[in-house]
């Protein structure tokens, strides 16, 4: 557990996969998905507009439509002052001033944020980033085949290429504008927009996949999956995955 002081309150947060309940982790991830794909502030709005313009210029009407729909949802979240990023933080709060915080409904999580309303966004974001990094590092250490983020590495490889090209342009005094523009556009459109609304929206799919996996783990292990912590859940998931792979290899 991590203990911090926010807005004059003593806050205990789950920061380890051997303590964090899987149901909380699922909710936490769900809000992070929304924050990454939609966001809830003006900088996210600007990013949606920039990407939408880029898709129109490329004639990519399908991704433009998705981006525009996400922009509309972003505006709704801004106007309703509902932040998925801070709701993800609330999912990790175990207790405030010794009082357990067990209501994981959106209303319950919002009450946690209201109670800590005196804390600055900067302070909350710093705590969230610190805890998120620790959880991510533990998952990558224990389950490298499940949490090896290849896409993130590819993105930062492109950032390095952009930096190297900009430096080369300065050193060689050569015009590399077209190459630089291509890399910047690639970075801008690196992550394709996801659909969040409707029955096939990312949130619905995320919840359905979790429910299905919980049923499978409970059946295979005889233990209620939703009562597991993150470490136990992914140990079970990894075991089932390896078992299925061995059975498939034998069949061949």
Describe each model-derived feature in a short phrase:
Residues 1-252:
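An amphipathic, hydrophobic-aromatic interaction surface with interspersed Lys/Arg
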């Amino acid at each position: 557990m991590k203990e911090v002081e926010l807005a004059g309150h003593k806050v205990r947060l789950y920061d380890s996969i051997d303590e964090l309940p899987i149901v909380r982790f699922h909710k936490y991830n769900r809000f992070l998905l929304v924050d990454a794909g939609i966001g809830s502030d003006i900088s996210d709005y600007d990013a949606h507009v920039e990407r939408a313009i880029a898709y129109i210029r490329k004639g990519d009407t399908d991704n433009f439509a998705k981006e525009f729909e996400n922009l509309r949802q972003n505006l709704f979240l801004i106007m309703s002052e509902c932040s998925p990023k801070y709701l993800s933080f609330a999912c990790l709060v175990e207790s405030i001033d010794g009082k357990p915080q067990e209501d994981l409904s959106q209303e319950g999580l919002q009450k946690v944020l209201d109670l800590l309303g005196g804390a600055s966004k900067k302070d909350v974001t710093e705590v969230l980033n610190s805890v998120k990094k620790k959880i991510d590092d533990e998952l990558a250490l224990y389950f490298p085949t499940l949490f090896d983020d290849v896409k993130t590495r590819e993105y930062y490889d492109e950032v390095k290429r952009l930096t190297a090209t900009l430096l080369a342009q300065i050193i060689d005094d050569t015009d590399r504008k077209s190459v630089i523009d291509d890399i910047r556009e690639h970075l801008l459109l690196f992550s394709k927009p996801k659909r969040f609304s409707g029955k096939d929206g990312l949130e619905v799919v995320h919840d359905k996949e979790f429910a299905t996996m919980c049923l499978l783990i409970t059946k295979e292990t005889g233990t209620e999956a939703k009562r597991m912590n993150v470490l136990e859940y992914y140990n079970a998931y990894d075991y089932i995955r390896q078992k299925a792979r061995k059975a498939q290899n034998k069949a061949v």
